[in-house]
Amino acid sequence: MKTIDLFCGAGGLGEGFRQAGFSALYANDHETPALATYKENHPDAVCSTDSIETVDPKKIREDLGVAPGQVDVVMGGPPCQGFSTYGQRRDDDARNQLYVPYFGFVEEFRPKAFLIENVVGLLSMSGGAVLADMVARAEALGYAADVVTLDACEYGVPQHRRRVFIFGAADGQRIDPPQPSHVNGKRSGVVLNDQPSLFFDGPSIQPALTVRDAISDLPDEVLVPRDTQKPMEYPEPPKTEYQRLMRGNSTELTHHSAKRMLGIRRLRLAMLHPGDYGTKIEERLADGGLNDELIDLMMGGAGMRDAAECRTQDREKEAALREVLKGGHTTPAKVMEFLDSQGFANKYRRLRWDAPSHTVVAHMARDCSDFVHPGIDRFVSVREAARFQSFPDTYRFPGSQFRQFRQIGNAVPPLLGRAMAETIKVAIS
């Protein structure tokens, strides 16, 4: 079964459809690094960075050698920054109109079904007018359009991630939304032999997967950012069915690199308990204080960032804190003068082992402060973020760590994409 994958990014939605038995004929994205990732993992697709606003869908269809109606699904997620509730939203953002050329592809290819994925901010964009226009355009082309909001954690993804899907089949045929395979909830990790397989035989509804289910088999130690492409060995066999699913036939671990930090940030992380936000730092510091082990870790622990790489003001602040600690001035009030400078401590958040991750975002490329590992005083690695998104370990992300985090944060979780692909496949087969 064939797809056209527009605004494809790194290929999360495409990977989900591939797992369901589809293959992409053509993929388009304006970001060259993201398309390079797509091409590496979907080598048979014709890939293009040409502007979707200027390409000719008819020429593309003819170049691909397909007639109208021969493609099964035209799918895509128009850039969501203009719709997003994460950060400032602008109703006049030009990116909000990119769904118009998307429907030009639907009109030209006349697929058996179409699918649009986007953030929940789309629902209220311009008072709902953008969504209404999307539905009207689909129905004008003969498609019965439905709109659903799904949380990825209900479809086998160890992450809370609510997204809107607009979809429909040709000739007015209805497509049922996918039924949840997992239920929102909290639990401890389950050993491999006791947990039924995802998408296979077993209870129809399973507990939501957790951070522990996702990453407890990965090494505590991580690579520095520049070594993000270097492979590592798995330290132990998979502990859960999800981990086995993610590993597949992979024999080595890739992209297990994390951001480094100065001692000030390391101390902030050390104060946080699982589930804590940065607002808890002062309370935790007052309760437990600073012991010699924490001070030694801050002064030269593994994973520390070289102060010479940092801004002048950061180097000066780091040096001042070290002098305070050397002098034995470790009262909570004195240390908090450094840890809560300009309110920065409030943005930190440590994950919980026994709950799904919160939403992975592209901003992790710049700052992972709200993705602190639940058991280690470091930020999550690229591969751990990919696990939260349900990218299999065989999925490769070429390029820098910055680009990897950005692409992963922007992606559709493959298992959520697979759930949509399976229900579309049933409807159009």
UniProtKB/Swiss-Prot annotation:
The keyword S-adenosyl-L-methionine applies. This is Type II methyltransferase M.AgeI. SUPFAM superfamilies: S-adenosyl-L-methionine-dependent methyltransferases (SSF53335). The active site is at C80. It is an enzyme of class 2 (transferase). Its EC number is 2.1.1.37. NCBIfam families: dcm. GO terms for molecular function: DNA (cytosine-5-)-methyltransferase activity; DNA binding. Residues 1-429 form the SAM-dependent MTase C5-type domain. One of its GO terms (biological process) is negative regulation of gene expression via chromosomal CpG island methylation. It holds the Pfam family DNA_methylase. Belongs to the class I-like SAM-binding methyltransferase superfamily. C5-methyltransferase family. InterPro entries: C5-Methyltransferase, C5_DNA_meth_AS, C5_MeTfrase, C5_meth_CS, SAM-dependent_MTases_sf. Keywords: DNA-binding, Methyltransferase, Restriction system, S-adenosyl-L-methionine, Transferase. It catalyses: a 2'-deoxycytidine in DNA + S-adenosyl-L-methionine = a 5-methyl-2'-deoxycytidine in DNA + S-adenosyl-L-homocysteine + H(+).
